[in-house]
Amino acid sequence: LPVGLPPAHFGAQAKKFTDYFKRDGIVEFVYRDKPYAIRITDVVCYPQAYAAAATMLHTLMDDPKAVVLDIGGFTADYLLLKNGKADLTSCDSLENGVILLYNKIRSRGNSELDLLLDESDVDAILAGRKTSYPAEAVRLVERLAQEFVNDLFSTLRERMLDLRYSKVVFVGGGAILLRRQIEASGKVGTPLFVTNINANAAGFEYLYRLEAAGR
């Protein structure tokens, strides 16, 4: 069973997390009205952002530094890579998830334009899809999204991560949503995007198969 934890929690919690799944006995559960009884014989834990970028790691082996940035709903997790290997001394979970952006847009849209914009409205505008909202609403959403991205990159710079001179692997639904703003920021040297929304889960399986093949 391959599982994962946010990079910032990996070092302290990985053993406890794997031990939880390795507990003795049969695990019984029902999935889609079908009962299952399984025994878990092997568990391996991986850092989440690293796993999501796993299929790109071979392209980063010659880079002294690269960064994986996983932008989710509640947090943005970053992890420094050195020659394609995770540096768990330089990682953290920042409270910069896109929920903050949604809330800010909702508040500003209501106060400045008397509009009630929900998440699906924001997603449609940021994706460039046609909506019935006026041009000033579109401009507000895009401006706040750009500010959100710029603020995130400034926070990373304060943590001694200058993205202008490195490859950055962007993963997570937030990164996919904000791709245009990321590319327009001018603050990322070489942005690379993992567009699979289930990239972490796929990465867990990929890394586990590599590890199992080498045993």
Descriptions of predicted regions:
Residues 76-80:
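Short beta-strand scaffold segments in enzyme catalytic cores
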Residues 1-66, 86-100, 120-215:
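Nucleotide/phosphate-binding catalytic cleft detector across ATP-hydrolyzing
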Residues 103, 107-111:
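Long, charge-rich alpha-helical interaction segments
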Residues 69:
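Phosphate-handling catalytic cores of nucleic-acid transaction enzymes
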Residues 82-84:
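Short loop/turn segments that connect beta-strands within beta-propeller blades
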Residues 113-115:
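Short, basic interhelical loop/turn and adjoining N-cap
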